[in-house]
Regions:
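Selective for proline/serine-rich intrinsically disordered segments
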Residues: 1-5, 24, 39, 195
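Bacterial N-terminal signal peptides that target proteins for export
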Residues: 3-16
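Bacterial N-terminal signal peptides
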Residues: 13-25, 184-186
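N-terminal soluble domains immediately following signal/targeting peptides that reside
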Residues: 29-182, 188-336
């Protein structure tokens, strides 16, 4: 027979464990960090190389309060190849587009980015708080192609089929034994040589941009100096990358608090000229500006990227030829076939 003291002891132990769970559970739950991602405009409205989007991250505790003293490492990867038709920038497919570390301000951080191609992007976010808490989230989202491009492709496809149809009827009228149609599509992409400008510096701010090549990350860095030495004071930095030919902002951070320096790994998506500007507001010195114009080295896309489209267009013309020839023979009297 069990002792009453044994039963009381076990019951007390169960009550103690239950109370401990209620007391310490909030503390354990408080260790969690929530990561939220938002774009403006909404993802459904974004299109490749149309307008830059505002990308924002919000980091909160489990109770919804913003986390102030923390940094986030952000990595953005381009869509992988896989569609029948390649994108406008096949070299960019499956590569890393951007990587940087940002400091939270009231639990938030935001930046501008112009998505270069259609497809499924992957954004990896690693959060590290000052008290040691960490969180990692991966956001996968899709950017749709411009509707006007699909309409243009459809119209061009119809035009090729009609061209083949007309050619089939013309060649059949001459009663030739065979008709050979050759479609030669040559796409020449001239890679512009990259000229690496020497870093420009003023009395306190220094902007540096590594030589840029399509398909590879280039380091963009800005740091504050005092008499040639690093100055760790906190400033608000605005960094902007602009596509000069299209006049569009492809990347920007605005009034980002930094401790004397900032760096990002950024891929310039095409072989064109870009302007990189940096502006910082310093308490006792006022605004500081820096600017560089760089030429990005383009790379000729592999033949396999254009092969599906080439075969598709040739197939349309061949189908039109066959249908045109068949319709002409079908309409002719039996003695003239």
């Amino acid at each position: 027979m069990r002792s009453p003291w044994c039963l009381v002891t076990k019951a007390s132990l169960h009550v103690f464990i239950l109370l401990a769970c209620f007391v310490f559970a909030p503390a354990l739950w408080g260790q969690e960090l929530n990561v939220y991602f938002k774009t403006t405009p909404r993802l459904e409205l974004l299109r490749p190389f149309a307008d830059p989007a505002d990308l924002a991250l919000l980091i909160t505790d489990a109770d919804g309060r913003p986390v102030d003293n923390a940094t986030v490492n952000v990595r953005l990867d381009a869509p992988t190849p896989g569609g029948f038709f390649s994108t406008d920038m096949p070299i960019v497919e499956g590569t890393r587009l951007n990587e940087m570390t940002l400091k939270l301000r009231q639990g938030r951080v935001s930046w501008k980015y112009l998505f270069p191609i259609r497809g499924e992007y992957k954004l990896v976010v690693d959060v590290r708080a000052a008290d040691g808490r960490q969180a990692a989230r991966t956001f996968v989202f899709k950017i749709r192609e411009n509707e006007s491009k699909w309409l243009a492709l459809g119209a061009f496809s119809v035009a090729l089929f009609v061209l083949g149809f007309g050619a089939g009827r013309v060649f059949t009228r001459t009663r030739a034994q065979a008709a050979l149609v050759v479609l030669a599509l040559s796409i020449g992409i001239s890679a512009r040589g990259m000229t690496a400008p020497s870093p420009q510096a003023n009395s306190v701010g220094k902007l540096e941009v590594e030589p840029a090549t399509v398909g590879k990350l280039s380091r963009i860095a800005w740091r504050l100096e005092n008499a040639g030495q690093p100055d760790p004071r906190t400033v608000l930095l605005t960094l902007t990358v602009t596509h000069l030919e299209k006049g569009k902002i492809v990347f920007a951070v605005e009034k980002l608090p930094i401790a004397g320096e900032f760096a990002t790994q950024f891929q310039f998506p095409d072989g064109a000229e870009y302007r990189v500007t940096a502006a910082a507001n310093i308490a006792d010195l006022g605004p500081v500006h820096g600017e560089q114009v760089i030429s990005v080295a383009g790379i000729e896309p592999p033949a396999r990227a254009a092969a599906p489209a080439l075969f598709y267009f040739i197939g349309l013309i061949a189908a039109g030829l066959g249908v045109g020839r068949w319709s002409k023979i079908r309409a002719a009297p039996p003695e003239r076939r």
